[in-house]
Every structure is written in structure tokens, then in C-alpha cells.
């Protein structure tokens, strides 16, 4: 049974109802509809913390989805799961792949920056200030991209860039 039929969360049910209506009225191929169904079920599983199920749905959606823009959001969500699982290298890979398909995903840039900043903090704790600076510089680049895409957002990142002298 599709996840959308068993989900008890009000918001997920509402989203599923609206998504089903849109799938009926917007002209799409059966493959696109099936890809979206897997994507929707992946989001539902992800919101409940069922990451293994979410990944299965996202991978199936990736197999079916051909639109680069839609694929970017699937890849982004896969990156979120890997971030939540502490698999930062995999997460960075998926965020990067999402940005290759859709360079207007500031949230992917931000998440990449957060991971790089975290790795910089880890390097400091390990006594490697040179490596830390490399990670912080990379975090700065990703935050600059996120801020350029959505000026006025990511205020804390903007302040960090100013405080550390990385804002240009």
C-alpha cells in the first residue's frame, strides 16, 4: 500500500491529497507521476525519521525522474538524510549533485557550508589549524553562494563571514 494511504500525520495527509489532485489535473506522463509518488512517499518517510524507507523511495524516484530540476530536490533530500545520519562525505556529494542540476538551491549551499564549518571545528579540536582554515574557507564560499541566492537570509552565516574577515 502506498505510504500516502497509511500516513496519519495531518500535514502529510493534506499534502498527499493536494499532490494527488495536481497529478490528476496537470498533464504528466505515467513515469512522471510514478516518480512523484515515490518522491512524496520518500518525504513522508523522511519526516517520520524512517530514513531507510525514504532512501528506497528517493532512489526509485531518481530512477524514474528525468527532469533535472526535480532530480535536484530528490538529491537534496538524500543529502539531508546522510547529514542526519552523520555521513557528511556522502551528504556533500549529494548536495553537490543537486547543485549541478539546479544551481539555485541556497539550502544546499548552506548545508554544505555547515558541514565544512563543522569539519573546521573538528580540525581545531584535533590541533590542525591549517586544515581548519581550509574547511572554514570552503564554508565561507558556500555561505557566500547561499547569501547571493537569497539576500537577507542566513544572517548568522553573514555575521560569521564578517567576524572572521571572510566577507567581501
Swiss-Prot record:
<dbReference type="InterPro" id="IPR051685">
    <property type="entry name" value="Ycf3/AcsC/BcsC/TPR_MFPF"/>
</dbReference>
<comment type="similarity">
    <text>Belongs to the Ycf3 family.</text>
</comment>
<dbReference type="InterPro" id="IPR019734">
    <property type="entry name" value="TPR_rpt"/>
</dbReference>
<keyword id="KW-0934">Plastid</keyword>
<feature type="repeat" description="TPR 2">
    <location>
        <begin position="72"/>
        <end position="105"/>
    </location>
</feature>
<dbReference type="InterPro" id="IPR022818">
    <property type="entry name" value="PSI_Ycf3_assembly"/>
</dbReference>
<keyword id="KW-0472">Membrane</keyword>
<feature type="repeat" description="TPR 1">
    <location>
        <begin position="35"/>
        <end position="68"/>
    </location>
</feature>
<feature type="repeat" description="TPR 3">
    <location>
        <begin position="120"/>
        <end position="153"/>
    </location>
</feature>
<comment type="function">
    <text>Essential for the assembly of the photosystem I (PSI) complex. May act as a chaperone-like factor to guide the assembly of the PSI subunits.</text>
</comment>
<keyword id="KW-0677">Repeat</keyword>
<dbReference type="GO" id="GO:0009535">
    <property type="term" value="C:chloroplast thylakoid membrane"/>
</dbReference>
<keyword id="KW-0150">Chloroplast</keyword>
<protein>
    <recommendedName>
        <fullName>Photosystem I assembly protein Ycf3</fullName>
    </recommendedName>
</protein>
<keyword id="KW-0793">Thylakoid</keyword>
<dbReference type="GO" id="GO:0015979">
    <property type="term" value="P:photosynthesis"/>
</dbReference>
<dbReference type="Pfam" id="PF00515">
    <property type="entry name" value="TPR_1"/>
</dbReference>
<dbReference type="InterPro" id="IPR011990">
    <property type="entry name" value="TPR-like_helical_dom_sf"/>
</dbReference>
<keyword id="KW-0802">TPR repeat</keyword>
<keyword id="KW-0602">Photosynthesis</keyword>
Amino acid at each position: 500500500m502506498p505510504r500516502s494511504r497509511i500516513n496519519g500525520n495531518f500535514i502529510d495527509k493534506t499534502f498527499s491529497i493536494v499532490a494527488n489532485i495536481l497529478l490528476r489535473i496537470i498533464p504528466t506522463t505515467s513515469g512522471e507521476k510514478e516518480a512523484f509518488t515515490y518522491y512524496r512517499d520518500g518525504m513522508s518517510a523522511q519526516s517520520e525519521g524512517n530514513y531507510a524507507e525514504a532512501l528506497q523511495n528517493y532512489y526509485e524516484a531518481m530512477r524514474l525522474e528525468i527532469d533535472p530540476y526535480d532530480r535536484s530536490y530528490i538529491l537534496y533530500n538524500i543529502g539531508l538524510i546522510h547529514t542526519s545520519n552523520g555521513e557528511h562525505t556522502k551528504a556533500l556529494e549529494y548536495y553537490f549533485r543537486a547543485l549541478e542540476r539546479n544551481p539555485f538551491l541556497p539550502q544546499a549551499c548552506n548545508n554544505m557550508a555547515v558541514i565544512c564549518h563543522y569539519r573546521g571545528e573538528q580540525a581545531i579540536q584535533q590541533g590542525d589549524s591549517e586544515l581548519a582554515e581550509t574547511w572554514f574557507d570552503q564554508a565561507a564560499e558556500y555561505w557566500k553562494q547561499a547569501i547571493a541566492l537569497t539576500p537577507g537570509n542566513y544572517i548568522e552565516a553573514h555575521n560569521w563571514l564578517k567576524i572572521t574577515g571572510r566577507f567581501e
